[in-house]
Amino acid sequence: QIETNKKCQGGSCASVCRKVIGVAAGKCINGRCVCYP
């Protein structure tokens, strides 16, 4: 998993993870987006 510094209040991490790892797979943990390659 790849932790990002993107906050994810009231939103999904799909667009963030798509930019970071090329796959829209991730979830919000402790207010931050965590992506799963």
From Swiss-Prot:
The keyword Oxidoreductase does not apply. Changing R18A: Loss of hERG blocking activity. The record marks R18, K19 as: Hot spot basic residue in hERG blocking currents. The record marks K27 as: Basic residue of the functional dyad. It is found in: Secreted. It comes from Androctonus mauritanicus mauritanicus (Scorpion). The record marks K6 as: Hot spot residue in hERG blocking currents. Belongs to the short scorpion toxin superfamily. Potassium channel inhibitor family. Alpha-KTx 15 subfamily. Keywords: Disulfide bond, Ion channel impairing toxin, Neurotoxin, Potassium channel impairing toxin, Pyrrolidone carboxylic acid, Secreted, Toxin, Voltage-gated potassium channel impairing toxin. Disulfide bonds join C8-C28, C13-C33, C17-C35. The record marks Y36 as: Aromatic residue of the functional dyad. This is Potassium channel toxin alpha-KTx 15.3.
